[in-house]
């Protein structure tokens, strides 16, 4: 069995919801699509049948993947966390030393990261640089554009909305 990994309780619920949907809705729909395509006769030249079989393979692979993820997840209720230093689950406000603009990041598990929502994976370069830091600390992060420097302004632990 592979190692456990952290995930927020909201992130875990989202994965479980997707898993249930795949098992109880998509799996049934794909089976119906295959049966309907079979009814059209010759399977060797049946594009609908091939498409349905491909979708079935995708759905089954995704179910297996999600079952593996949920079995290895270490669920963390971020709202119950606290502390003065940055760790998994923190919502961090930083000041970019160059532009003096505020940026905010939520440090989450790898399966719930979404940069468009400012959620960064615990394994990302920015999160790795931030872990263990406190308010007032200066953090240097290697980015594709070079080294960026930030000052930690606030650290909070609160539930995220997914």
Swiss-Prot record:
Coiled-coil stretches noted in the UniProt entry, renumbered to this chain: 44-69
InterPro entries assigned to the protein according to its UniProt record, in alphabetical order: GreA/GreB_C_sf, TF_GreA/GreB_CS, Tscrpt_elong_fac_GreA, Tscrpt_elong_fac_GreA/B, Tscrpt_elong_fac_GreA/B_C, Tscrpt_elong_fac_GreA/B_fam, Tscrpt_elong_fac_GreA/B_N, Tscrpt_elong_fac_GreA/B_N_sf
SUPFAM superfamilies, per database record: FKBP-like (SSF54534), GreA transcript cleavage protein, N-terminal domain (SSF46557)
Source domain of life: Bacteria
One GO process term, biological-process aspect: DNA-templated transcription elongation
Keywords, alphabetical: Coiled coil, DNA-binding, Transcription, Transcription regulation
Disulfide bond positions: none
Family in the record: Belongs to the GreA/GreB family.
Protein name per the record: Transcription elongation factor GreA
UniProt gene name: greA
């Amino acid at each position: 069995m592979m190692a456990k990994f952290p995930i927020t309780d909201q992130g875990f619920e989202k994965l479980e919801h997707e898993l249930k949907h795949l098992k109880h809705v998509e799996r049934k729909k794909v089976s119906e699509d295959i049966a309907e395509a079979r009814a059209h006769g010759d399977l060797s030249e049946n594009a609908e049948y091939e498409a349905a079989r491909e979708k079935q393979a995708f759905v089954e692979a995704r179910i297996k993947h999600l079952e593996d993820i949920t079995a290895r997840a270490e669920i963390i209720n971020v709202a119950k966390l606290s502390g003065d230093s940055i760790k998994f689950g923190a919502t961090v406000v930083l000041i970019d030393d160059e532009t003096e603009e505020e940026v905010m990041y939520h440090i989450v598990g790898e399966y719930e990261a979404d940069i468009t929502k400012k959620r960064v994976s615990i394994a990302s370069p920015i999160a790795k640089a931030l872990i263990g830091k406190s308010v007032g600390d200066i953090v240097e992060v290697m980015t594709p554009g070079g080294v960026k420097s930030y000052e930690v302004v606030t650290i909070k632990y609160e539930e995220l909305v997914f």
